[in-house]
Curated annotation (Swiss-Prot):
Keyword rRNA-binding applies: yes
Entry-linked InterPro entries: Ribosomal_uL16, Ribosomal_uL16_bact-type, Ribosomal_uL16_CS, Ribosomal_uL16_dom, Ribosomal_uL16_sf
Gene3D superfamilies per UniProt: Ribosomal protein L10e/L16
GO terms classed as biological process: translation
Organism: Dehalococcoides mccartyi (strain ATCC BAA-2100 / JCM 16839 / KCTC 5957 / BAV1)
One GO CC annotation: cytosolic large ribosomal subunit
Protein family membership: Belongs to the universal ribosomal protein uL16 family.
NCBIfam families linked to this entry: rplP_bact
One Gene Ontology molecular-function label: rRNA binding
Protein name: Large ribosomal subunit protein uL16
Keyword Ribosomal protein assigned: yes
Subunit structure: Part of the 50S ribosomal subunit.
Length: 149
């Protein structure tokens, strides 16, 4: 499972998850992607389950890119423990995902296969998602030039 090799601080505050993703919100590596429609925490186990669902469906046909990494430790106090006595021990790792974040990408497969793989993957996610395809945007200032005959 994914987790950082080293961290500067063992325990972190919970933080806020509101707002849209400004980074990681475009398809960068593959042709198709799974995009988050809401904010949430995605655990390392959920990321691994999603990766397995995608790779099992596409077999050896394509390539998968995981665009999120669980770098936030979540602490938990033991069961039946009285409150106080400090913050609990780190229990699991999560990736903080905001609205619009690209989480997984696929390349080298047909659009139908990619859509089905992402549909299966979306069942493993705790947030609402959508299937997106790579668009080749026209750079500002450029216009599409038709070939002269």
């Amino acid at each position: 499972m994914l987790q950082p090799k080293r961290v500067k601080f063992r325990k972190v505050q919970r933080g806020r998850r509101d707002g849209a993703a400004h980074k990681g919100n475009t398809v960068a590596f593959g042709e198709f992607a799974l995009q988050s429609l809401e904010a949430g925490w995605i655990t390392a186990r959920q990321i691994e389950a999603t990766r397995r669902a995608i790779t099992r469906y596409i077999r050896r046909g394509g390539q998968v890119w995981i665009r999120i990494f669980p770098d936030k430790p979540i602490t938990k106090k033991p069961a039946e423990t009285r409150q106080g006595g400090g913050k609990g021990a780190p229990e699991e790792w999560v990736a903080v995902v905001r609205r619009g974040r690209i989480m997984f990408e696929i390349g080298g497969v047909t659009p139908e296969a990619a859509k089905e793989a992402m549909r299966l993957a979306s069942y493993k996610m705790p947030v609402k998602t959508r299937f997106v395809a790579r668009d080749i945007p026209v750079v500002a200032g450029e216009t599409e030039v038709e070939e002269a005959e």
